[in-house]
Amino acid sequence: MMPMPRPHLKAFALLLACLAGQALAAPQHALTLYDEAPKYPANFKHFDYVNADAPKGGTFRQAGFGGFDSLNPFINKGVSADDIGLIYDTLMTQSLDEPFTEYGLVAGKIEKAPDNSWVRFYLRPEARFHDGQPMQAEDVVFTFNTLIKDGAPLYRGYYADVAEVIAETPRQVLFKFKHNNNRELPLILGQLPVLPKHWWENREFTKGNLEIPLGSGPYKVAEVKPGRSIRYERVKDYWGKDLAVNRGFYNFDEMTTDYYRDSTVTLEALKAGQFDYRLETAAKSWATAYDVPAVRQKRLILEELPNGNPTGMQGFVYNIRRPLFQDVRVREALSLLLDFEWTNKQLFNGAYTRTRSYFENSDMAARGLPDAAELKILEPLRGKIPDQVFSQAFANPVTDGSGMIREQQRRAYKLLQEAGWRIVDDKMVDAQGKAVSIEFLLAQTEFERVLLPFKRNLADLGIDLVIRRVDVSQYINRLRSRDFDMIVGGYPQSNSPGNEQREFWQSAAADNPGSRNFIGLKDPAIDTLVEQLINADSRQSLIEHSRALDRVLQWGYYVIPNWHIKTWRVAYWNHIGHPKVSPKYDIGINTWWIKPDVEPAVPLAPAAQPAEGAK
């Protein structure tokens, strides 16, 4: 044999290295973020937080808010029906008692490159759509390409680091990555729903309508009353019903959702037995509105379930696309005028804690001054991020709860003067001499009473706050077109923040209708911090990068932080059962069941009719 020239030897060595890397990649039943061992072994029988022998049957009745006009949740058009995701299966499914571990669903086995440059999914041969057609690799490729091309903008952000998707065999699909730094990407791809190519290829995917789509999941759509109600039926011959990841799940024969336009009416409908379950989000209602015979007789159960998730950030969000809010001094000044202590005492019965961090209730929340590891991340950005990041620990203003906030108003007025604002004829005018009027856009009535004290505090400084409530459809359309001054916005966080942060904070998402960059952030420094967070190579590194990002967001005053609790408040009728062990990171409503030996609540006359249709 002739000796191989040296350049060819180098290429041959690289080939051997690649082959060695592929040989080291063994198919596995689960994926974890940092390759730690999953909680459940390959032969596990069911998750710990289910009743594996839960009875099947009955109808589970829920209430929705507003209405719906679409059965396509994947596009940025219309309002999709609640729970429509139950008709679809995903490649993998996330356990609800681990921070971020996924187990095979449509994909029975998963293979990941040791250097994180690709991931391969092996589809189960028994996986079927509801029409009996097998789920194949070409369906996965079709789904991915369709979501990238025609889906909501968030998918392009989620999958931005995917270079190529290949159907290698009818049941084997490979995703190649642009780089190997995004450790979350294999798990993000595991969340990919599998849409039927043969059903969608002759339909217009971007057309949001009420045609019942073909799915593969544990439920199918049985009946639609546009804007008013939707009914799902459990698929009796569901292909995945005996999988370990599904045992103890999907116990209701039917699930129905009736839509209401008013939260107060919805609560009265629950107490009248019109539906079975409610997640209560209003502290005052939880404290005072359930003093009824059904609760005292323990037929209507009130329960607080532990919530182990980061609570994230809910707040009054500024749209900094508006010139009014582009000066950070203005944003800080207005934040001084929310009297949380009075609001919590008078309106919330003291139920809440003030939110400070964008990663609240987690080890990713910034605390005190940045440590050495955080400074290593932040120092290269000095001069491009607020100076306070390096020298001060962020804190919300604190009042005495009396409702008198003269000191905060004086500080706010001083900041507004520095920004060029001034009082003219008892009205605040901005630096251009225009009277300041702020529209606060709402879709739900319960926040109006919360905003009224804030409105009064602004009025004391000559600022007019207009509270504008619109229906859900109009609200969503205005959010998508960024036609608002301020809103109540939420930035939920998981225990493993990653690709979704691009949708929240990055410049590329600011002009994408449908992204969650409600603020309109276009800051290269924040873009950099987000990418570094996504590419963190260990849990400790993720914590450090999350804290660094948190500090920059806090000192930008992009929202006026609201409040949080660390439990889920649920009310449900006593014919509903749930497992003794609750999952740490979810309510786990799909593990609940109907008790066959307890009669459901007999509905009384409804307080009002449900919504008549989405507008």
Residue ranges and their predicted role:
Residues 124, 207-210, 240-290, 336, ...:
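Ligand-site clamp/hinge motif
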Residues 87-98, 145, 189-254, 261-265, ...:
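Gly/Pro-rich hinge or "lid" segments in bacterial periplasmic/extracellular proteins
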Residues 50, 54-55, 77-83, 109-153, ...:
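Aromatic- and charge-enriched surface segment that lines or borders ligand/interaction sites
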Residues 26-115, 122, 145, 214:
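N-terminal lobe/hinge region of extracytoplasmic solute-binding protein
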Residues 106-111, 130, 135, 176-195, ...:
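Aromatic-rich, solvent-exposed beta-strand/loop patch
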Residues 28-31, 64-66, 79-82, 86, ...:
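Detector for C-terminal structural segments
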